[in-house]
Amino acid sequence: MKRISIYCLLMFCALLTASAQQTKQLVILHTSDTHSRIEPIDLHAADPYAGAGGVVRRATFLKDFRTKNPDVLLFDCGDISQGTPYYNLFRGEVEVRMMNLMGYDAMTIGNHEFDFGLDNMARLFRMAHFPVVCA
């Protein structure tokens, strides 16, 4: 009986080892300091990033990237707000809705998330389909 138990334990360990050899790749993407950049930077702006940025480009990149890399985590490091009239008019709602559509997994807060006060920040967090984390 003891031999059968040891044999079963060894077989279990062998099967566990065999299954552990299958590796997966996890990709972590993050955005940071997007500052309400819903539209691309004006093509004619005196800016090295003129014509770049914007939610449509980001969403397209993420869709294409996830097609080729199914195991992706997407985070934002804060400061999604402040910087354009979108934030001044809608107080972060546009930004959070876009992040929901792009499938963010989590975000943390930056200093500009406090710009319209704690009540507004709490409202945005309730709208988010992802956790807002901070240490």
Where are the predicted features?
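General helical structural elements
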Residues: I6-Y7, L62
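Sec/Tat signal peptide C-region and signal peptidase I cleavage site
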Residues: L16-A20
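N-terminal catalytic scaffold of extracellular/periplasmic and nuclease hydrolases
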Residues: Q21-A135
